[in-house]
Amino acid sequence: MTILSTITSISRPNKISKSFVSSNGGSSISMGSNSVACYNACGGGSSYSYSSSYSGSGLDYSYKANYSSSTGNNSYVVIASSTCNCN
């Protein structure tokens, strides 16, 4: 996990476009939690769109960083592609 800690910084352009992911046990992906993460990341009041696409299996997935507002910790989960656009 120490290697993955180097990917936590994400640029913040005027119109934010980021990847947000959430999982249970680091393997199964939860759409509901993803939507909550997207809502929180957009400030809780901004409108947003959310989309996901998955491919591959096991180690073919890429690792992304996810910040959990409930625990205050960063966790690393397995996803293929997940994007949140703040309007």
Curated annotation (Swiss-Prot):
GO biological process: sorocarp development
A Pfam family reported for this protein in Swiss-Prot or TrEMBL: Coiled
Family: Belongs to the hssA/B family.
Alphabetical list of PANTHER family matching this protein: HSSA/B-LIKE PROTEIN 1-RELATED-RELATED (PTHR31059), HSSA_B-LIKE PROTEIN 1-RELATED (PTHR31059:SF5)
Protein name per its UniProtKB record: HssA/B-like protein 57
Organism: Dictyostelium discoideum (Social amoeba)
Gene: hssl57
